[in-house]
Amino acid sequence: DARHMGVEMNFTYRPVKWFELEGMLSVGDWVWDSNAKGYFYNQNGEPLKDLRGTVASGILADDHAWAVLNQKGVKVGGSAQTTGSIGINIRPLDGFRFGLDWVASGRNYSDYQVSSSNYSANSTINVADPWRIPWGNQFDFSASYSFKIAGVRATLNGNINNLFNHYYVMDAYNNITTAGEWDNVYRVFYSFGRTYSVRLKVNF
């Protein structure tokens, strides 16, 4: 089991009709709260006595091979535990809006992947501390214009995500028994570069 605790704050401030400031901050503390125990089976679903393929006398019998992941207290990986954003929306003309948001994430930890080389029957695998991924951030730009087409209201939206084409690490994996560092992680996933989207919405 994993324990997920944290606090989150959102705010919106509109001093005048045409200007809006908004933001959010989320701070979490996610750790594995218990160890995990599993049992070995072959591809036919039969319980194994050992890793050489010997079939045990029964499921969860005394000779059914097992392994324990000693992971209690280790940080949960795969998702940033601190996220925040701050942005502005400006409406200079009737129906027109544009906005700019700064989005940041931190305290993101690498995930681990268990392979057959980590296992031995009836033993405990000590899960090492994951790599703390450097924080990342990007700017997102958006604009919209509302108007009428033959008496029908329509809105044209455009977005440029990651406006400055900034790359940062979003996810990574490290060996389950080796303390995670930048030079021993693998399967590193980076953020998307600059992307664009345009959408037309018509309300009938």
Regions found by a protein language model. Name each.
Residues Q43-G58, Y119-V127, I176-Y186:
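Surface-exposed loop/turn segments flanking beta-strands in extracellular/periplasmic regions
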Residues D1-V114, K201-N203:
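Gram-negative outer-membrane beta-barrel transporters
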Residues R3-M5, A80-G84, W135-F139, V152, ...:
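Residues that define the transmembrane beta-barrel architecture of outer-membrane proteins
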Residues G95, V103-Y119, Y145-F204:
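C-terminal beta-signal and adjacent terminal beta-strands/loops
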Residues T12, G77, N89, P130-R132, ...:
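Residues embedded in well-ordered secondary-structure elements
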Residues G6-E8, L69-V74, N126-W131, D183-V188:
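Extracellular loop and loop/strand-boundary signature of outer-membrane beta-barrel proteins
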Residues Y13, K17, G87, F141, ...:
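Conserved beta-strand->loop/alpha-helix structural units within folded catalytic cores of enzymes
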